[in-house]
């Protein structure tokens, strides 16, 4: 079937066979299908949708467009975790060592930050000397030796997704649930883990803005993973306000270490405990309550922090900075953002805070932009807190000439009120193949 006919079929609401999806995706990767044809087809998908079966097949075709990682040289069940992204979302740096300290192998491939959301690999590289580009042999050997490695995602994984995402980004087809689900799950299937926990963030700092949208996406991704023989669960977590207090690369590493040392912010600690417990459940380690207790125990006895240091040391990192934060690269300047009035913080838009941190140099506005590892923001007041005029809302770190623009961006998402806003839950729901459990 010609690509023209396949575009017309989806435009008219038809359902594609696997062979048709292979023709579209593989044709696009090889160059036989032009950008304008792929853009037309994706817009047809955006407008007409896909069946769950169709989306599962598309995901598998996309996964097989590149390298399929075989983790069988690593014995035992391997559990992966993926977050749909957010501001101050440093959970991987906390939960990977917790789960590994509980005896479950973590062979994780993570990404870099783009736009207002940060990336795990950028955060890891703020620890001086840390290598995130390991060979497959080094990666497998480290996981077999210490039970944990987090590296940058291979360029060869889900090749179709890279091309399709870049095109979606410029053709107004990003916010399409079948295309989002196939994008995320194609990379997860290709990465080779036996079980996958999805952290689907929701709110202003997340891609999905409502809980219902997030649940719809989570159900589809769980269905795709289950269809392909993986154990999958998804947590719906809040991202209306950043997790923890720190946004920025080395700043988020410091805060993650605080959680592993048992002295981190309550919200970040709670979300990490729930994520870690659900990963352990997927690995068959026990009931949710038993697995939560295991996670708490390895924080309390110091073994989770020790495992994190062991990972950084194995990958060349200077682990002294994890104990003494003054050894991190220091910011060029600091700036205190002061409250302009008395009142409760009714809204503290996470996306605006993330964008402000990017303006300071903590993130990228386009691929390839250099990072200032010391740049970022520490929040002193968050949604629901009462502030007095002149009190510090946040400390900005970075080059002094960037503070004015960053402060304007931050304040554009700040709303004061006379009454304390209702507290939002940290976790809204758990989605498994058996259904949705709302909290």
Q: What are the residue ranges of the model-derived segments?
A:
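Well-ordered secondary-structure scaffolds
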Residues: 5, 17, 28, 68-69, ...
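Phosphate/diphosphate-binding glycine-rich loops and adjacent basic-rich segments that engage nucleotide
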Residues: 144-193
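A glycine-rich helix N-cap at a beta->alpha junction
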Residues: 123-149, 219-225, 229
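Glycine/serine-rich anion-binding loops at beta->alpha junctions
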Residues: 77-100, 104-116
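Acidic, glycine/proline-rich low-complexity segments that act as flexible tails and inter-domain linkers
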Residues: 1-88, 309-318, 433-434, 439
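General beta-strand structural signal in soluble alpha/beta enzymes
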Residues: 106-110, 132-135, 150-153, 197-200, ...
């Amino acid at each position: 079937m010609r690509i023209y006919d396949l575009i017309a079929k989806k435009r008219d609401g038809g359902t594609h066979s696997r062979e048709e999806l292979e023709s579209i995706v593989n044709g696009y990767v090889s160059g036989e299908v032009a950008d304008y044809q792929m853009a037309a087809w994706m817009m047809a998908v955006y407008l007409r949708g896909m069946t769950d079966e169709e989306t599962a097949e598309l995901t598998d075709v996309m996964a097989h467009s590149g390298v399929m990682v075989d983790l069988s040289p690593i014995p035992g069940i391997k559990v992966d975790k993926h977050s749909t992204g957010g501001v101050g979302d440093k959970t991987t740096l906390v939960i990977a060592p917790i789960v590994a300290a509980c005896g479950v192998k973590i062979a994780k491939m993570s990404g870099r930050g783009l736009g207002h959301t940060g990336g795990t690999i950028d955060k890891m590289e703020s620890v001086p000397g840390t290598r995130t580009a390991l060979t497959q042999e080094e990666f497998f050997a480290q996981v077999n030796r210490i039970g944990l490695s987090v590296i940058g995602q291979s360029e060869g994984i889900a090749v179709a997704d890279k091309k399709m995402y870049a095109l979606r980004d410029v053709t107004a087809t990003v916010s399409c649930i079948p295309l989002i689900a196939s994008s995320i799950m194609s990379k997860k299937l290709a990465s080779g883990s036996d079980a996958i926990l999805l952290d689907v963030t929701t709110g202003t700092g997340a891609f999905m803005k409502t809980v219902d949208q997030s649940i719809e996406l989570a159900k589809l991704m769980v269905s795709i993973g289950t269809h392909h023989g993986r154990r999958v669960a998804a947590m719906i977590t809040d991202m209306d306000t950043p997790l923890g207090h720190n946004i920025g690369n080395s700043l988020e590493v410091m805060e993650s270490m605080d959680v592993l040392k048992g002295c981190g912010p309550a919200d970040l600690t709670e979300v990490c405990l729930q994520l870690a417990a659900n990963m352990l459940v997927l690995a068959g380690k026990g009931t949710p309550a038993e697995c939560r207790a295991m996670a708490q125990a390895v924080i309390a006895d110091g073994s989770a922090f020790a495992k994190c240091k062991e990972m950084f040391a194995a990958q060349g990192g200077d682990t002294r900075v994890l104990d003494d934060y003054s050894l991190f690269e220091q910011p060029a300047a600091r700036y205190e953002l002061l409250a302009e009035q008395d009142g409760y913080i009714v809204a503290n838009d996470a996306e605006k805070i993330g964008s402000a941190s990017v303006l300071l140099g903590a993130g990228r506005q386009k691929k390839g932009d250099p990072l200032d590892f010391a740049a970022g923001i520490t929040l002193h007041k968050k949604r629901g807190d009462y502030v007095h005029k002149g009190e510090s809302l946040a400390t900005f770190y970075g080059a002094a000439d960037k503070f004015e623009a960053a402060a304007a961006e931050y304040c554009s998402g700040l709303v004061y009120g006379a009454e304390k806003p209702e507290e939002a839950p940290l976790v809204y729901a758990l989605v498994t193949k058996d259904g949705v459990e709302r909290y």
